[in-house]
Amino acid sequence: LELPLREPKNSKIPKNLANAINYQPIEILKARDFILVYDNQLKIENIKINRFEFDKINIDPGGVAFTSPGKYCDFVSRFFTPQSSIFEDSVTGSSHCSLIPYWSRRLNKKKLKSIQLSERTGILGCEANKNHVLISGKAKTYLKGKIFI
């Protein structure tokens, strides 16, 4: 996939978001989504979210990406959307539009490997370019069909 690069900027954490999570981040960024940066993968694996408090946040159309350096890759992430029927997204290309430039700059690498630590788990090849990001990975077709208009 080739998607637009969204450069994240430093931000402050909304009060409801701070109250909704069990670990406070070491860095807060914002592009379309909030990006909460942590110091290790274990915190991303064990993040707990109070859904009642989390759903008070209005960041439509965005969500919240939790990220840290990875044990076996360049970075890991998880992605949650408040007020959504799908609380945690399995593999989120749109959040990587901001995660890739952040980690590329921080690690001083153009090509990165990312793992999204959802229940399904997604392993992505990532690359930051001037105005866009490239995302690759393995996928399986689960549905084929035709639409007649």
PLM feature spans:
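Active-site proximal loop and beta-alpha junction motif in alpha/beta enzyme cores
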Residues: 1-149
